[in-house]
């Protein structure tokens, strides 16, 4: 995890979770990306353009970068 933090040192999102992409679903203007980190999953909704630009694919390693002001909590 320390190595991954070094990789993204120049971005403002200090909370970084590195995992494997389990799913990328593009629908219209948005894309859903599911990242597996250990035995947990995190789902992010990003623009379809961003998903295409980053060429996100199932099985790739990716990092979820979170800013404390941009985290949403949902009751489950």
Predicted regions and their residues:
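Glycine-centered tight beta-turn/hairpin loop motif at sheet-sheet or coil-to-beta transitions
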Residues: 37-39
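Glycine/charge-rich catalytic "coupling/switch" loops of P-loop NTPases
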Residues: 1-24, 28-32, 41, 48-76
């Amino acid at each position: 995890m320390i190595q991954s933090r070094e990789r993204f040192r120049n971005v403002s999102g200090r909370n970084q979770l590195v995992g494997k992409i389990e799913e990328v679903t593009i629908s219209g203007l948005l894309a859903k990306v599911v990242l597996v980190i250990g035995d947990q999953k995190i789902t992010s909704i990003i623009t379809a353009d961003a998903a295409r630009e980053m060429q996100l694919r199932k099985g790739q390693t990716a990092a979820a970068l979170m800013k404390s002001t941009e985290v949403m909590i949902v009751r489950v």
